[in-house]
A protein has these predicted regions:
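A short, contiguous, amphipathic alpha-helix enriched in charged residues
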Residues: 8-38, 99-102, 106
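Broad gene-expression machinery/nucleic-acid interaction feature
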Residues: 1, 31-35, 49-53
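Glycine-rich, histidine-containing beta strand-loop boundary motifs that form or position
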Residues: 4, 38, 56
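Short, Lys/Arg-rich flexible segments
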Residues: 1-3, 7, 24-25, 108, ...
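Short histidine-centered catalytic/ligand-binding loop motif
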Residues: 3-12, 85-92
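Single-stranded nucleic-acid nicking/binding segments centered on His-rich, glycine/basic loops
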Residues: 40-50, 57-185
Length: 185
């Protein structure tokens, strides 16, 4: 299963087109069947929480001489790193990074086509050279508690991280301004 966040800036129809394009790419790339379930935000949650669950078969689909379709050998996504290495294929970790990049590229293409000035990046803050800390996934149980005004350890952690990241972004703006003034002198 692959879970992807869908841009809330896109309409429902455009989000569906985005997920379907990605699912087709995965099906063609790995020779598997793909099923998609698009979820919209629940009434009590974050109204931007559009996401999709993408299920892939563990076996490849192949058309038999009879015309029927059958599940056959393991797909690349189900192979162990040893099996991948024997076949000269990237490791599971490398493949996951490639899938994340593929998702970012197709999402950014759809955002651009919709004339929306927003982009996503598949890389971590560290890999992007940003001195920002990542937040932790809150999960549905903690989200429900937080919505009721009950603070959770993960929620507290994320609030501290957001404060820190905001301070770091403000510091970067100040440093950039100071550098510009220094260069003018």
């Amino acid at each position: 299963e692959i879970v992807v966040n869908l841009p809330h800036e896109l309409s429902g129809r455009l989000r569906m087109m985005l997920v379907n394009d990605f699912a087709k790419d995965l099906a063609n790339q790995y020779g598997v069947a793909v099923d998609v379930a698009i979820h919209t935000p629940d009434a009590q949650g974050d109204n931007r929480n559009h996401h999709a669950h993408i299920m892939l078969t563990t076996r490849k689909l192949e058309r038999l001489e009879s015309g029927r379709v059958a599940l056959t050998s393991k797909s690349q996504l189900e192979m162990s790193n040893t099996q991948l290495k024997e076949r000269g294929l990237p490791s599971a970790r490398e493949e996951l990074k490639a899938i994340r990049e593929q998702w970012a590229n197709i999402t950014n293409k759809h955002l651009k086509e919709a004339k929306i000035d927003a982009r996503i990046d598949h890389r971590s803050h560290k890999d992007r050279g940003l001195e920002l800390l990542p937040t932790k996934k809150l999960g549905w149980e903690a989200s429900a508690l937080e919505r009721k005004g009950i603070k959770t350890a993960t929620g507290d952690y994320n609030r501290k991280v957001e404060e820190y990241n905001h301070a770091m972004q403000q510091l970067a703006i100040i440093e950039k301004s100071l550098n510009a003034v220094t260069e003018q002198r």
